[in-house]
């Protein structure tokens, strides 16, 4: 979990193995707007950790509403703030523990510019008359419940063939 708080710095928290001890973090995080990129991808994982935002600002949706040709975080930071983000670790294996120092640095850099990006996107959305649209979209994503379990089509075919489990296929 990557956290950047104005005046407090950047924090990286690996919740693996401490999922049941994140209550104090949840209490602190329940007081501020969360700035996320592609919130609909992050929130389900954060909900599994009992982390719920009181308000969301999704930079990806902001980019869509502003008609940006590319809406990756890297593209938006370059277009709006004029900085290039290194993305050489985006396809790394994040399941290996402990995380390598290079991966930790990469994860921290991902959130370093989110406050500035939010501020500039907010100004742009206000000028375009679309800030309220963003608020509505972000609230819908924030309130969205957990995703239903993925359909596993092999189960239906397996039942018809008398197969009891996936391994028997």
Q: Can you name each region flagged by the protein language model?
A:
Residues 51, 66-67, 81, 85, ...:
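Hydrophobic/aromatic-lined pockets within catalytic cores
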Residues 1-75, 79:
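Conserved RNase H-like, two-metal-ion catalytic cores of nucleic-acid enzymes
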Residues 73, 87-88, 125, 132:
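Secondary-structure transition/capping residues
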Residues 75-103:
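A short, charged helix-loop
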Residues 56-57, 88, 115:
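Short beta-strands and strand-loop turn motifs
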Residues 48-49, 85-86, 144:
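Short, flexible segments with low predicted structural confidence
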Residues 101-169:
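Mixed-charge, glycine-rich, non-catalytic linkers/tails in nucleic-acid processing enzymes
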């Amino acid at each position: 979990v990557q956290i950047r708080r104005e005046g407090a710095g950047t924090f990286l928290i690996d919740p693996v193995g401490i999922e049941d001890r994140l209550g104090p973090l949840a209490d602190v995080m329940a007081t501020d707007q969360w700035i996320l990129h592609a919130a609909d991808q992050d929130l389900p994982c954060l909900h599994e950790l009992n982390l719920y935002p009181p308000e969301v600002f999704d930079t990806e949706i902001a980019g869509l509403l502003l008609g940006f040709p590319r809406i990756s975080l890297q593209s938006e930071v370059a277009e709006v703030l004029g900085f290039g983000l290194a993305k050489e670790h985006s396809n790394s294996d994040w399941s290996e523990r402990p995380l390598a120092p290079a991966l930790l640095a990469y994860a921290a850099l991902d959130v370093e510019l989110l406050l500035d990006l939010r501020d500039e996107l907010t100004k742009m959305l206000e000028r375009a008359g679309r800030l309220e649209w963003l608020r509505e979209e972000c609230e819908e994503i924030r309130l969205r419940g957990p995703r239903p379990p993925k359909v596993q089509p092999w189960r239906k075919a397996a039942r018809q063939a008398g197969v009891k489990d996936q391994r028997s296929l």
